[in-house]
Amino acid sequence: MVIAVYPGTFDPFTRGHEDLVRRASNIFDELVVGVAQSPNKRPFFALEERIHIAREVLGHYPNVRVEGFSGLLKDFVRKNNARVIVRGLRAVSDFEYEFQMAGMNRYLLPDVETMFLTPSDQYQFISGTFVREIAQLGGDVSKFVFPSVERWLVEKVGRRHAESDKTA
């Protein structure tokens, strides 16, 4: 049984993320989507919200489970007995960072491989950062995220706008 881990911040979980999960779940016996705490990135959604959102989107995949983690990826990979780390590459700009991370992961986990998947054409330009910016500026994100994720975004953006109106 080959277990793979697909780690990320998933802030928010996009159609591009789901595309990679769908494809990776067809390759591996079990896929663990690891939602990283990532405090240095100052996520828009709290860790528990991101886990909940990912579970809403991915609940219909029988061989996929979603777990949150903090700390080193190597510890999460070991905890889940994974033999592969799945990473997405959208563009050449992603490659340099991901290549360095794969090298470090190989050093820390010599018996674990990193597998890169490129997104389907319609998802190559989607990033969580772009989706958050569009949502915060009142734009339509429905083509980039699932309806449940869009509802979370609209609610969160509305709360933040209401809070900033109170302080202004």
From Swiss-Prot:
InterPro entries given in the database record: Cyt_trans-like (IPR004821), PPAT (IPR001980), Rossmann-like_a/b/a_fold (IPR014729)
Residues that, per the record, bind ATP: T9, F10, H17, G88, L89, R90, E98, Y123, Q124, F125, I126, S127, G128, T129
Keyword Methyltransferase: no
Entry keyword set: ATP-binding, Coenzyme A biosynthesis, Cytoplasm, Magnesium, Nucleotide-binding, Nucleotidyltransferase, Transferase
GO biological process, one term: coenzyme A biosynthetic process
EC number assigned by the record: 2.7.7.3
Function: Reversibly transfers an adenylyl group from ATP to 4'-phosphopantetheine, yielding dephospho-CoA (dPCoA) and pyrophosphate.
Name of the protein: Phosphopantetheine adenylyltransferase
UniProt gene name: coaD
